């Protein structure tokens, strides 16, 4: 499939307290290297504290930042944060809308509880190549895949 690239595009990163700081840094670097931007979405407008104690300012609050605003999304959560997202309609909708719009979705393993609450498999990458585990694959690989802009196979798989 053609790969127009991710330059000029926007990655929405849904971030919770305790999310892995190294994964966030790698995503930011890989996105910048492709000429794209990152927008941080947090459960509250004040931002979050990531795993190394750094306070990360939110560009958007979850309730006002649906995944439709982004070309691709990533979910960086720790278990407690993922459970909190799963309990919120906006958290579940963020995921289900991204799936419905055939977006590439990067995630860390703690997001499994959010996927389950949204009615998805807890390991969605086993059935859908549009999901990329950032716990298993480098951020640069995820961003390169995002250059395809959409994972259209998902739409074809659900149409039949």
Residue ranges and their predicted role:
Residues 101-108:
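ADP-ribose/adenylate-binding Rossmann-like module
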């Amino acid at each position: 499939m053609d790969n127009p690239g991710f330059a000029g595009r926007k990655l929405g990163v849904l971030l919770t307290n305790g999310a892995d700081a190294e994964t966030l840094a790698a995503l930011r670097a890989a996105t910048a290297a492709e000429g794209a931007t990152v927008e941080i979405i947090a459960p509250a407008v004040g931002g979050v504290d990531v795993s190394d104690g750094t306070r990360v300012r939110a560009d958007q609050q979850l309730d006002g930042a649906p995944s439709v605003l982004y070309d691709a999304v990533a979910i960086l959560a720790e278990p407690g944060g993922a459970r909190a997202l799963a309990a919120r309609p906006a958290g579940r909708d963020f995921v289900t809308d991204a799936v419905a719009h055939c977006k590439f979705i990067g995630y860390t393993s703690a997001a499994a509880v959010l996927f389950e609450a949204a009615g998805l498999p807890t390991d969605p990458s086993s059935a859908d190549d549009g999901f990329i585990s950032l716990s298993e694959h480098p951020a640069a690989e995820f961003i390169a895949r995002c250059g395809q802009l959409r994972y259209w196979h998902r739409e074809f798989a659900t149409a039949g």
